[in-house]
Amino acid sequence: MHSRTVFFVSDGTGITAETFGNAILAQFEMKPRHVRLPFVDTVDKAHQAVRQINHCGEVEGKKPIVFTTLVNMEVLKTLQDGCQGMLLDMFGTFVHPLEQELGIKSHHRVGRFSDASHSKEYSDRIAAINFSLAHDDGQSHHDLAGADVILVGVSRSGKTPTSLYLAMQCGLKTANYPLIPEDFERRQLPPALEPHRKKIFGLTIQAERLAEIRNERRPNSRYASLDNCRAEIAGAEAMMRRSSIRWLSTTTKSIEEIATTILQELRPERLVY
């Protein structure tokens, strides 16, 4: 049973409100019900949002929490005047003080990604996603020279989600390559990766956690057995040490933490823009 309903109201996609709101909610031991209300860009839609929020409060007997990134003042005022939830206006909290500090007025432009599809950054991100999908799980060795990052590790150690995050969020062309027992027997990196060693970053994981993940995919198989997981991890870590590959354990880290560590180690310039 959720302890409270949280609404994310935006005149755009609602992703900014949801991301910011979830970062704040993560500080509290609770499991709220999430409701995203995107494209609330007219007064009529704001009235609909107010009715939905207030009805939720009446049914649950608790004030909903409402995070909003509305920039249209008329739409925002409609929400402020009618909403019976706890309203947290993110843009209002930060934009006005920044206007005063910078001495300039903000655009109050709806949708911060409104022109994104025509930007070089957007095109680069799409290219990075396509590259990462084409080079997922060692599918292709073609154009590894064009990779920004190459992730290596045993199967199910977190390579694919990290690759896609680096592509989507950072615009990095990221290949990932599984390390398998045949690689451990050779005691060296796969030949296709050797020329690109400076781009390689390794991911490892605790054997118990790996066995748990693999058992969800192939229950009671040798692939998922704890002994096999231990052997593969030991082989992969030994190889990375011999090859002087930087690596980290993904066991207790989020994708965001993993990706940020990789950026710090391999592409620190991407942290400054």
Swiss-Prot record:
Task performed by this protein: Bifunctional serine/threonine kinase and phosphorylase involved in the regulation of the phosphoenolpyruvate synthase (PEPS) by catalyzing its phosphorylation/dephosphorylation.
Keywords assigned: Kinase, Nucleotide-binding, Serine/threonine-protein kinase, Transferase
Catalysed reaction, written as an equation: [pyruvate, water dikinase] + ADP = [pyruvate, water dikinase]-phosphate + AMP + H(+); [pyruvate, water dikinase]-phosphate + phosphate + H(+) = [pyruvate, water dikinase] + diphosphate
Protein name: Putative phosphoenolpyruvate synthase regulatory protein
UniProt similarity note: Belongs to the pyruvate, phosphate/water dikinase regulatory protein family. PSRP subfamily.
Keyword Acetylation among UniProt keywords: no
Keyword Nucleotide-binding: yes
Residues that, per the record, bind ADP: G153, V154, S155, R156, S157, G158, K159, T160
Enzyme class: transferase
Molecular function terms, GO-annotated: ADP binding; ATP binding; phosphotransferase activity, phosphate group as acceptor; protein serine/threonine kinase activity
Entry EC no(s): 2.7.11.33, 2.7.4.28
